[in-house]
């Protein structure tokens, strides 16, 4: 009885951890570099649009201040 109990747990422990370790790191490495390229391109387009928005917002701010003065 003591002899068969030892080999059974030893055998499954080795194959289970070895199998998942290999596929996990290989699979994510490939998809990660692919999406990085499109994300960078999109960010470049969004960056120039951001500064355009605050510029028109700045003149709107004083208008709101004038309305407050008129209310007072």
Swiss-Prot record:
Q: Give the Low complexity compositional bias ranges.
A: 37-50
**Tissue and organ expression note:** Developing endosperm.
Role description:
Sulfur-poor seed storage protein.
Region (Disordered) residue spans = 1-61
State the organism named in the record. Answer: Hordeum vulgare (Barley)
- Alphabetical UniProt keywords: Seed storage protein, Storage protein
GO terms (molecular function) for this protein are: nutrient reservoir activity
Q: Domain of life of the organism in this record?
A: Eukaryota
Output this protein's name: C-hordein
Q: Where does the chain cross the membrane?
A: none
Mind giving the lineage of the organism this protein is from? Answer: Eukaryota, Viridiplantae, Streptophyta, Embryophyta, Tracheophyta
Stretches of Pro residues bias are at: 1-36
């Amino acid at each position: 009885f003591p002899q068969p109990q030892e080999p059974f747990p030893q055998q499954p422990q080795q194959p289970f951890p070895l199998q998942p370790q290999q596929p996990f790191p290989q699979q994510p490495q490939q998809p990660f570099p692919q999406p990085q390229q499109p994300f960078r391109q999109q960010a470049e387009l969004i960056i120039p649009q951001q500064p355009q928005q605050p510029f028109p917002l700045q003149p709107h701010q004083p208008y709101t201040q004038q309305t407050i003065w008129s209310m007072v």
